[in-house]
């Protein structure tokens, strides 16, 4: 058996050791980022501009270290890959400790900053300004976001990994573009009951209406993503 093979154990041990070292390196990197952010805040405070500056802190993606049997990796549509920190400090508009559960995407940053600067985002700008979310008035906001990865001819080990996914406040559907037939390898998760995405509901009959709606909504999001 595989786990009894000395060569297999040697290979697995080397992968584990490499992963542990990468975790340590990433921890050091984050500590360095934290120090850098602190230095920026110190300079702004000394110049008297700290509370007059909108500071947005976010990550471009998450990372896997064993979740879903992956790691180190970041390209998949599971929560560890697509859900990342998004923090804003701007005392003029945002009270400290405010938390929002609305679905944001990185494309929302540009129109937000344009509006903060007194401008009006043009029709070619993707994303939406998040400033309306900071008001106390009810706001009609997006109900789902699109996540996708195009892997063909990128790296040999990633061929066939192209996917398009839709995430709502509760569900996620991952459609593997070049795997299986008629979406038989697609994945559907109830993030409320299964936050770690361990139970694929794609073939669950009770969830068939949800699956079909998500498929339709995914097509609409892809169509709206001009050029993608």
Could you tell me what each predicted segment is?
Residues 134, 202-205:
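A general structural motif at alpha-helix termini
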Residues 1-104, 116-124, 175, 179-182, ...:
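Active-site-proximal cap/lid insertion segments
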Residues 61-67, 102, 107-110, 115-191, ...:
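C-terminal cap/loop subdomain of S1 sulfatases and analogous C-terminal strand-loop tails that border
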């Amino acid at each position: 058996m595989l786990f009894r093979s000395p060569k297999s154990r040697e290979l697995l041990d080397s992968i584990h050791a490499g992963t542990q070292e990468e975790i340590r390196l990433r921890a050091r990197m984050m500590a360095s980022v934290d120090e850098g952010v602190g230095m920026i805040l110190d300079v702004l405070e000394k110049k008297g501009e700290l509370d007059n500056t909108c500071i947005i802190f976010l990550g471009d993606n998450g990372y896997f270290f064993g979740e879903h049997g992956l790691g180190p990796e970041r390209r998949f549509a599971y929560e560890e890959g697509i859900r990342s920190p998004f923090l804003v400090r701007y005392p003029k508009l945002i009270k400290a400790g405010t938390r929002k559960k609305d679905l944001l995407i990185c494309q929302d940053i540009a129109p937000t900053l344009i509006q903060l600067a007194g401008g009006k985002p043009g029709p070619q700008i993707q994303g939406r300004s998040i400033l309306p979310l900071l008001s106390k008035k009810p706001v009609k906001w997006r109900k789902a976001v699109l996540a996708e990865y195009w892997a063909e001819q990128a790296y040999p080990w990633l061929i066939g990994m192209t996917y398009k996914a839709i995430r709502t406040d509760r569900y996620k559907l991952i459609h593997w573009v070049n795997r299986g037939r008629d979406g038989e390898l697609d994945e559907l998760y109830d993030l409320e009951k299964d936050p770690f995405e361990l139970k694929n509901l794609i073939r669950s009959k009770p969830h068939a209406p949800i699956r079909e709606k998500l498929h339709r909504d995914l097509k609409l999001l892809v169509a709206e993503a001009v050029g993608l």
